[in-house]
């Protein structure tokens, strides 16, 4: 398991582009099964608590494989904002270009998110109980995954 942090998304994926093209990390990338990019997971989703949506769900089977093994009712839902092409507009795309299964996971309800890209984005909007539940259940789900039950693939509709 690899944890990465990068910045500069709003300036053109600067951080994720830099780390995804770092040749010193190629051995890690060649052994990577999937990349989970968490983005705006501090609020309750339109699907309720303990639920996220995955961008680009139509491009791979990652969500189906994950949901088959999900712990404690955690649910990955299809992207309700697919028309906005968030899959190609977030840091995961730097890894998609390397043909690594990479999707963003979010809880943001764009119909209610008045703080999105605004100064009003503040700690008071965070639903800590829901965030903790999602993190804990995501971790418990990852513990259940192995090469025998988790080998996600892109389909032929994704644009590398």
For each feature predicted by the language model, list its residue ranges.
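Metal-dependent peptidase/peptidase-like ectodomains
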Residues: 7-109
